[in-house]
Amino acid sequence: MTPTPIQNAPQSAVTRQALALAGVFQAAAVVDQLARTGQCDERAWNTLIRATLDTNPDSFATIYGGHHNNLRLGIDTLSAVMNRQHSDPAVMRYGFSLVLLMQKLRKDDAMMASLGERLTRIQGQAEHFGDTHENVIASLGQLYQDTLSTFRYRIVVQGDPSLLQSRMMPERVRAALLTGVRFALLWHQQGGRRWKLLFQRQGIKKSLAALDGH
């Protein structure tokens, strides 16, 4: 993989929101890839996991590894949604469901605190084994199951039943869902709101198109 240069974080609030929302849809696309094929885009996966483990990033750009191309899968997926091009209904459903799940999480202070505490412990695991080691992924998946999946509102993942039941696949899917909620929280922190999406659609499309040119 060719390394990409570190970029400064975008100054535009809408661009930051677009990148954070692209992270949500990158997670949605990865969930769909795993559920249907058992494999996923490695760069997209690594970016999502590292962003979730880094609970105290130095900057906005640090969250996604310093270059927006680390969110390329999410940018392309979100662009298709915003431009009403052909997009997988399952991926759209996962993406917007992750935003809904984030909203429920924000209302539960105890769960937010628990997530933070357990992520700190999982960071220690990652330092020992590596960010994407299966022990770390298993812990992230268990964290999702113990917290976010206890809400009455749940995300139902559809795909190949034999793949979804294979070794480590439930953990990988749950870990990917957790990363999507992490980016949904980032989107909210940057001023993103569901009710604004309709009004900001053109601005988000413009921001995503500008990212395609760099």
Swiss-Prot record:
Belongs to the HflD family. Gene3D superfamilies: HflD-like. It comes from Chromohalobacter salexigens (strain ATCC BAA-138 / DSM 3043 / CIP 106854 / NCIMB 13768 / 1H11). The keyword Oxidoreductase does not apply. Signal peptide: none annotated. PANTHER family: HIGH FREQUENCY LYSOGENIZATION PROTEIN HFLD. One of its GO terms (cellular component) is cytoplasm. Pfam families: DUF489. It is a peripheral membrane protein. The lineage of its organism: Bacteria, Pseudomonadati, Pseudomonadota, Gammaproteobacteria, Oceanospirillales. Its main location: cytoplasm. It is found in: Cytoplasm; Cell inner membrane. SUPFAM superfamilies: YcfC-like. Keywords: Cell inner membrane, Cell membrane, Cytoplasm, Membrane. InterPro entries: HflD, HflD-like_sf. HAMAP family: HflD_protein (MF_00695). This is High frequency lysogenization protein HflD homolog. It comes from the Bacteria.
